């Protein structure tokens, strides 16, 4: 079915309702503060200095999928284990998670690693590099480094606070005019030779594993670079994802995480060519696919379809969501080509300019 009559209205919603308040001052202060924090963390911990490689700016803002002002930033601090440790990934019973096994005995006689041997051993449990222990170590290191920065008054114009938030250590920056959060997450970079069996392979040099504070030793696999590559240069897919996120928020369905919608889009990209197609085509394709997945009670994890992203959503919630999405699709299909139906769909009144 053709939905070109929705095009102008969707473009207007995308332009007016999903604006990112991209303040250059936020970006400038963020780069300055995180740069100093990394320097102090290196000075404070020889282990961090040895393992740290770089920052990957992740999340909706940097992937151009954010639908609100730029006051939250996701930063993955990439750590690389020495090759000499002969790292091995072991799949766990929970899909999407791995144990990271290392052999510390391999570096005991290497002078270069003498200073990190003891702190590295403290982060291991029976030869497993513990996600829980490294998260606790990372949290303490950030707090200690932040205390040094605040005591030294490096940034007298800002107030810096830290608190825990899920898998991240969150740093709040209070400026004279606003505030924003930086979510810092320790993340292992792993060679592609460690790619686990049963996972879909994509052209890449690395995979990543993210520390989870609610796990004992396990790490969650992450495919940051691969997902960026999949979503890049694919017509109006990203604007359509933003519209679906906006629809989700307007309908108060926060249990449908942004990553669920991104995953639906990645599956659609395997079977649909979005290049040269309209925003209305991309939006309706993703909306109909989301509805289909909700009806099936399954959004397969893109990298391992054995994992269902909806497995923690209550069946009553999914039943209600299914009915809501069906009603939305019915309204769009029976609206006699009236684009103002989107005001009702999005619970938002917007006039075309």
Curated annotation (Swiss-Prot):
Mg(2+) binds at residues 72, 74, 183. Mn(2+) binds at residues 269-270. Its cofactor is Mg(2+); Mn(2+). It is an enzyme of class 2 (transferase). The keyword Aminoacyl-tRNA synthetase does not apply. One of its GO terms (molecular function) is metal ion binding. Belongs to the mab-21 family. Nucleotidyltransferase that catalyzes the formation of cyclic GMP-AMP (2',3'-cGAMP) from ATP and GTP and plays a key role in innate immunity. Acts as a key sensor of double-stranded RNA (dsRNA), the presence of dsRNA in the cytoplasm being a danger signal that triggers the immune responses. Directly binds dsRNA, activating the nucleotidyltransferase activity, leading to synthesis of 2',3'-cGAMP, a second messenger that binds to and activates Sting, thereby triggering the immune response via activation of the NF-kappa-B transcription factor. This is Cyclic GMP-AMP synthase-like receptor. The gene is cGLR.
């Amino acid at each position: 079915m053709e939905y070109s009559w929705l095009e102008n209205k969707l473009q207007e919603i995308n332009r007016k309702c999903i604006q990112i308040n991209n303040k250059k001052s936020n970006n400038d202060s963020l780069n300055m503060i995180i740069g100093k924090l990394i320097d102090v963390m290196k000075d404070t911990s020889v282990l961090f200095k040895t393992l740290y490689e770089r920052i990957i700016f992740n999340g909706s803002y940097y992937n151009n999928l954010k639908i609100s002002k730029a006051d939250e930033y996701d930063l993955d601090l990439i750590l690389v284990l020495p090759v000499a440790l002969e790292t091995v990934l072991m799949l766990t019973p929970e899909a999407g998670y791995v144990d990271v096994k290392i052999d510390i005995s391999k570096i005991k006689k290497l002078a270069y690693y003498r200073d990190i041997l003891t702190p590295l051993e403290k982060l291991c449990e029976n030869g497993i590099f513990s996600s829980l222990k490294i998260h606790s170590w990372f949290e303490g290191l950030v707090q200690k480094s932040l205390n040094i920065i605040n005591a030294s008054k490096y940034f007298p114009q800002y107030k810096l606070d830290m608190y825990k938030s899920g898998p991240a250590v969150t740093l709040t920056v209070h400026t004279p005019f606003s505030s924003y959060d930086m979510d810092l997450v320790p993340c292992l970079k792993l060679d592609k030779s460690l790619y686990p069996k049963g996972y879909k392979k994509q052209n890449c040099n690395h995979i990543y594993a993210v520390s989870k504070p609610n796990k004992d030793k396990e790490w969650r696999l992450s495919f940051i670079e691969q997902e960026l590559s999949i979503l890049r240069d694919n017509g109006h897919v990203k604007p359509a994802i933003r519209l679906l996120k906006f629809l989700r928020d307007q309908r108060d369905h926060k249990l449908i995480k942004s990553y669920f919608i991104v995953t639906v889009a990645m599956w659609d990209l395997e079977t649909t060519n979005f290049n040269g197609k309209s925003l209305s085509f991309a939006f309706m394709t993703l909306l109909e696919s989301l509805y289909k997945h909700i009806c099936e009670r399954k959004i397969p994890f893109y990298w391992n379809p054995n994992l269902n992203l909806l497995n923690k959503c209550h069946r009553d919630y999914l039943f209600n969501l299914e009915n809501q999405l069906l009603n939305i699709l019915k309204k769009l299909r029976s609206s006699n080509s009236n684009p103002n139906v989107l005001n009702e769909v999005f619970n938002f009144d917007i006039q075309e300019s």
